[in-house]
Swiss-Prot record:
It catalyses: 1-(5-phospho-beta-D-ribosyl)-ATP + H2O = 1-(5-phospho-beta-D-ribosyl)-5'-AMP + diphosphate + H(+). Keywords: Amino-acid biosynthesis, ATP-binding, Cytoplasm, Histidine biosynthesis, Hydrolase, Nucleotide-binding. GO terms for biological process: L-histidine biosynthetic process. Its EC number is 3.6.1.31. CDD domains: NTP-PPase_HisIE_like. This is Phosphoribosyl-ATP pyrophosphatase. InterPro entries: HisE, PRib-ATP_PPHydrolase-like. Pathway: Amino-acid biosynthesis; L-histidine biosynthesis; L-histidine from 5-phospho-alpha-D-ribose 1-diphosphate: step 2/9. The keyword Nucleotide-binding applies. It comes from Bacillus thuringiensis (strain Al Hakam).
Length: 107
C-alpha cells in the first residue's frame, strides 16, 4: 500500500517538474493553489455525501480523489511524503486516548 501512495506521489511530482499538456495534474498546477484547494473542498463534500448515503463503493472512490488532490497540494507546497510519514511516526501512540484530545465541539 505504501508503495502505491509513493508511486502516485512521485508521478505527481514528475508532472510538476515536467508538465504534460493534456495532464489533469498539470492543469491543477497551472491554475495554482486556489484551484487545488477548491478541488479538495469539493471532494471532501463528496466524501461526506457518500458516507451519509452509506455508499461504500462511492466513498472509496471519493476518498481516492481526496487523497490525490491532497497529494497535489503537498507537491505544490514542496512537502514530501517523507515529511508526512515523519509526522505520522511522531504522532504514533500520542493523543490516542479520548481524554488526551480536545472535544470536537470546542474546536
Amino acid at each position: 500500500m505504501e508503495n502505491t501512495f509513493k508511486l502516485l506521489f512521485e508521478t505527481i511530482g514528475e508532472r510538476k517538474r515536467n508538465p504534460l499538456p493534456e495532464s489533469y495534474t498539470n492543469y491543477l498546477f497551472s491554475k495554482g493553489e486556489d484551484k487545488i484547494l477548491k478541488k479538495i473542498g469539493e471532494e471532501c463534500t463528496e466524501v461526506i455525501i457518500a458516507s451519509k448515503n452509506n455508499d461504500k463503493e462511492e466513498l472509496v472512490k471519493e476518498m481516492v480523489d481526496v487523497l490525490y488532490h491532497c497529494f497535489v497540494l503537498l507537491a505544490e507546497k514542496n512537502i514530501s511524503l517523507e515529511d508526512i510519514m515523519a509526522e505520522v511516526t511522531e504522532r504514533n501512540g500520542k493523543l490516542s486516548r479520548v481524554g488526551d484530545r480536545r472535544e470536537i465541539d470546542t474546536l
